From Swiss-Prot:
GO molecular function, one term: metal ion binding
Residue positions binding ATP: 3
Protein name: Nucleoside diphosphate kinase 2
The family this protein is said to belong to: Belongs to the NDK family.
Catalyzed chemical reaction(s): a 2'-deoxyribonucleoside 5'-diphosphate + ATP = a 2'-deoxyribonucleoside 5'-triphosphate + ADP; a ribonucleoside 5'-diphosphate + ATP = a ribonucleoside 5'-triphosphate + ADP
Main EC class the enzyme belongs to: transferase
Keyword terms of this UniProt record: ATP-binding, Kinase, Magnesium, Metal-binding, Nucleotide metabolism, Nucleotide-binding, Phosphoprotein, Transferase
Annotated source species: Pseudotsuga menziesii (Douglas-fir)
InterPro entries named among the record's database cross-references: NDK-like_dom_sf (IPR036850)
Purpose of the protein: Major role in the synthesis of nucleoside triphosphates other than ATP. The ATP gamma phosphate is transferred to the NDP beta phosphate via a ping-pong mechanism, using a phosphorylated active-site intermediate.
Length: 27
């Protein structure tokens, strides 16, 4: 699951925006 910073940040940003998996990533 290694991706460029831009792609990783984009996916993380979308997930955090939803807030559904924000907790999963946070922990």
């Amino acid at each position: 699951m290694i991706k460029p910073d831009g792609v990783q940040r984009g996916l993380v940003g979308e997930i955090i925006s939803r807030g559904d998996f924000a907790i999963d990533i946070g922990r």
